Amino acid sequence: MSKSEQLFEKAQKVIPGGVNSPVRAFKGVGGTPVFIQKAEGAYITDSDGKKYIDYVGSWGPMVLGHNHPAIIDAVLKAVPNGLSFGAPTESEITLAELVTKLVPSIELVRMVSSGTEATMSAIRLARGYTGRDKIIKFEGCYHGHSDSLLVKAGSGALTLGQPSGPGVPADFAKHTLTCTYNDLDSVKTAFEQYPNEIACLIVEPVAGNMNCIPPKNDFLKGLRALCDQYGAVFIIDEVMTGFRVALGGAQAYYDVKPDLTTLGKIIGGGMPVGAFGGKKEIMEYIAPTGPVYQAGTLSGNPIAMAAGLACLTELSKAGNEEKLAAQTKTLAEGFKALADKHNVPFTAQYVGGMFGLFFTEQAEITNFQEVMKCDAAKFNRFFHLMLEQGVYLAPSAFEAGFMSLAHSDEDIQATLVAADKAFAQL
């Protein structure tokens, strides 16, 4: 029995399912989850001492690679001054200034401790600001585990929200309308049906929780126009895409300006940080300047602020954005070429520093329905073949992969050598 197997057995006695976030349990791919002991650069090392080239990167935050010296140094300098104050600090101002500089649509920003907090708070703010209750989200898009956003999509162009499982009251979930990603007509239908009731529309600008699905054509600009037409707040959820698709986020890459933006992952440099921000007139509706309440004991935590500031400062250096995108392109197109070589039905999609692997006959995957038709069983086999060769991909056919600046050309080539062998066995 491996050390990971021993630890998983032990964990299940004191932690529900043995993990503190469901995807870590490997239920999507089968087998025992790998327990990590340490990480450095592009590599993670498990409890048995085996090293893996890591394309999960803690689900996105580790864009500089693990244990980056600039972040570690910033944290070590901040720690002696105290771990938490529950009071304002200069570091939260400095990070906020950098965020508003990098993302011009954000005029004011509020720090929180997670992406879920960010999206939950942004939706509450939009509801308070507009005086409306209903929200629009998209099938297959994930915005954290708050009640408003944990709803089952159902079929058809438009579905009144149904609870995705126990714990979400139907009377609450009914205010969530679910539309089809990359389908403006489904959104138009929602607005036409409830023209004066929709507080906001929230969207992942690149859907990263049904693998990696970029927006088609002018999908995002079409959403912007519909929100303007019907007086709804347009929220772009950049928890995953922020600073990764481009320094200014996916909104800069696709040239679209939201009313509110949610951030997470990279903004904390590996520490628990989230944020939401946007137009001054909307953000001033949040307490203490406005009537919509939001608070957090650890919001703006000084250690987390130091890590986030170091991460964004390093990431902002000339050439890093281009390097990240180029490395991602090399990897994704390399996967596709090898699949073609071995006659495996497959497509790879990528943008900026994120990518998705789909086992499908389709040349392009554009929404959740198409994702569900992909061969998840084949992905699971591919995942384990890669894992055996020391490559750690996302343990789910529905999650995006992440490149980091620490991945070298040699790391990518080693990954593709492993992929060549894996595709040959499918």
From Swiss-Prot:
Residue positions, PTM N6-(pyridoxal phosphate)lysine: K265
Signal peptide: none
Localization, UniProt: Cytoplasm
GO MF terms, alphabetically ordered: glutamate-1-semialdehyde 2,1-aminomutase activity; pyridoxal phosphate binding; transaminase activity
EC number of this enzyme: 5.4.3.8
Protein family (similarity comment): Belongs to the class-III pyridoxal-phosphate-dependent aminotransferase family. HemL subfamily.
Entries under PANTHER family matching the protein: GLUTAMATE-1-SEMIALDEHYDE 2,1-AMINOMUTASE, GLUTAMATE-1-SEMIALDEHYDE 2,1-AMINOMUTASE 1, CHLOROPLASTIC-RELATED
Protein name: Glutamate-1-semialdehyde 2,1-aminomutase
Organism: Actinobacillus pleuropneumoniae serotype 7 (strain AP76)
Gene transcribed to yield this protein: hemL
